[in-house]
Structures are given as structure tokens and as C-alpha cells.
């Protein structure tokens, strides 16, 4: 199962995932670490890496479904988080130290977060740690992911998603 706002899909089937045993109640944000085409990144994860994600967002704002939402992606290295989270990879439009993302990617990230929260009936709560319903990869592993640029957007993402959900009940 994927969001209706997906532009493309890369069928992972049962690869690089496990069945969920928890309900979806959070979103975890990642960065690609490159300005990768989201279809290419999803296929690379599916075919060559021991990682996966539910969604991939390109710098052009395109959204690609990877691991179906009814399955747990291998994203953070923390099974408990991945069991309850939808994991989203976002392409970077610049490299470090900022690892910025494009305006189009941010707009698509907001739209996807809104859609997920609506369908699973939860609000985003940015606490800055693993206990919120909006989390980041670096909360579970020694990594810079999702990078300073997206980290600086987390509170605003949470506030804007919740504002939209409240206004358009």
C-alpha cells in the first residue's frame, strides 16, 4: 500500500523488509546524501544495499514508493522505530556540511507527511528525540542523516503539518 500522491513505484516485494507488528504512529526523515534520482535510489536500495525506505523524494518533488506501508523498511537500524514509522528519504541539492534540499522536495515532504498523518490518524510531535512522532535517522544511529538543513526544518514541518490537519479536518 502506498500514498495516492506517489508519482512512481519501485516494487520491493518482500525484499529488505519485514511484516509490521505495530501500528503506524510516526514518520522518520532521512536524506539521500546526494542529489539522486529517487527511482535510482530506490532501485539501488532494493538491489544492492541492506537498507530500504517506504518513500523516496527527488529534488524535483517527485515521490517514489519503495517498501509498501504494510511492511517495515530497514531504515534506521532500530527495529522498534521502524516497526511504527513510515521512513522517507529526501534527495539533497547540495553536499555537506549543510546537505540542503530543494523547495520542491520540502513541499512534497510536507504533502506526504500530511497524507500519512491523515490516513493513520496521528499528529506530528517534534520533541527532538526518539520519543516524538517525527523522528530522524540520527536519533537511532551514529550518522549525520538527515543533515543540518533538514534538522533545522523539523519543528516547522511538525507545526505546518499539524496546522493543515487542524484547518482541513
Predicted regions and their residues:
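N-terminal catalytic cores of peptidoglycan-degrading enzymes
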Residues: 1-82, 145, 168
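Structural preference for beta-strand elements that scaffold enzyme active sites
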Residues: 26, 85-87, 133-135
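Short, charged/polar low-complexity linear motifs in solvent-exposed/disordered segments
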Residues: 81-84, 160-161
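Basic/polar, cationic surfaces and motifs that engage anionic cell-wall
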Residues: 1-21, 94-169
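Cell-envelope and extracellular/periplasmic
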Residues: 33, 84-98, 139
